[in-house]
Each structure stands twice: as C-alpha cells, then as structure tokens.
Design a protein with these regions (language model features):
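Cytosolic nucleotide-binding catalytic cores of signal-transduction proteins
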Residues: 103
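Tight coil/turn sites that cap or link beta-strands
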Residues: 96-100
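Register-specific beta-strand positions within repetitive beta-rich fiber domains
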Residues: 125-133
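Short, aromatic/His-centered strand-loop micro-motif at the edge of beta-sheets
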Residues: 89-95
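Exposed extracellular interaction/assembly regions and N-terminal maturation sites
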Residues: 1-84, 111-112, 132-133
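Short, Lys/Arg-rich amphipathic alpha-helical interaction segments
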Residues: 107-122
Length: 133
C-alpha cells in the first residue's frame, strides 16, 4: 500500500510530481495545473506534443492559479503545427513541427495572464572561417 507519510516525523507529504508527458493532440484541449485539476489533461514541465489530423489548439491553464515564473517546455515532435492560446482564448504562439518552446508566466493578475515565450534550437548555424581567424 502506498503511503504519503514522512519517515522523519510522520507528517503527511504529497506524492512527487511528474516531469514529462507525451501528448497525442487529436482535438483541441484545455490544460490544467496538476495541483488544481484531476484527469489527464495537465501541464507537465516537459511535454512532447504530436498533432495529427487537423489544426489543433492547446489552451493554457489559468495563470492566476499559480505563481509568476511557473514554466514548462513544449516540443512539437509531430509533422503538423498547432496553436497555443491563453486561458481567455488569446493567441500566445504557433508551434511549428520540430520546434521547442519555453513558456513562463510574467503576470498572473488575470486568468489569461501574461506569458513570455522563447524558441529553443530552431534553425541552423555554421562557423564563419573569417570570424574565427
């Protein structure tokens, strides 16, 4: 039987969170924060998303349910782009095939919040021999 009691004082401790989730996106989905939502559609710190069969949207959870700085990475491992919207339906990002995006909350004053996003490792680069000399 699983217990959530500390061996160092018998206080109740929560189960550990998960850090990775594979998402098969076959319809629009609204995510929730794991501490506020039951079910499978929760945010994980790292999510690999495969969008198939259409143009789908991921709606982010309410920003005002967590602290500023809450973050996660979304990697599109499929061949189809998908959209990301805030909790009020506003456009946040389009994640193209092969892209990885880092999302974090900079304001949680509303459910929509203010999200900052940057792209990891998209594109190519090469050394310029004249710059190296």
């Amino acid at each position: 039987m699983t217990t959530y009691t500390s061996v160092f004082g018998n206080e109740t401790i929560p189960p550990s969170g998960f850090a990775y989730r594979a998402v098969a996106l076959t319809a629009d989905v609204t995510l929730g924060w794991p501490e506020n939502t039951t079910g499978a559609d929760t945010v994980a710190p790292i999510m690999n998303v495969t969008a198939t069969g259409g143009t789908w949207t991921i709606t982010l959870p309410a920003a005002n349910e967590v602290s500023v700085g809450r973050d996660f990475i979304v990697r599109n491992v499929g061949a189809t782009s998908f959209y990301v919207k805030d909790n009020a339906g506003g456009a946040v990002a389009t994640v193209a095939a092969g892209e990885s995006r880092y999302f974090y909350i900079t304001s949680n004053a509303t459910a929509a919040g203010t999200w900052s996003i940057f792209t990891y490792g998209t594109g190519t680069s090469s050394a310029d021999a004249s710059a190296l000399a």
